[in-house]
């Protein structure tokens, strides 16, 4: 690998803005905000959705069936 061309990979704290849940992970993302997490200071990255608030992971998922073009065609012409 060539030196000085890759972004710095470091630990950062991601915070779900809808639930306030925080978790530590590695990232190359930069931030001006910092937060104290488990006794250490890390850069803070705010996210709108994480595994703590996403419906797939929380079990509060809604299943909606959107009619596609084929379904609309079949309805229109009385097929099936």
Curated annotation (Swiss-Prot):
It comes from the Bacteria. Gene3D superfamilies: Ribosomal protein L31. One of its GO terms (molecular function) is structural constituent of ribosome. PROSITE patterns: RIBOSOMAL_L31. One of its GO terms (biological process) is translation. Keywords: Ribonucleoprotein, Ribosomal protein. InterPro entries: Ribosomal_bL28/bL31-like_sf, Ribosomal_bL31, Ribosomal_bL31_B, Ribosomal_bL31_sf. Pfam families: Ribosomal_L31 (PF01197). SUPFAM superfamilies: L28p-like. Transmembrane segments: none annotated. GO terms for cellular component: ribonucleoprotein complex; ribosome. Part of the 50S ribosomal subunit. Belongs to the bacterial ribosomal protein bL31 family. Type B subfamily. This is Large ribosomal subunit protein bL31B. It comes from Streptococcus sanguinis (strain SK36). The gene is rpmE2.
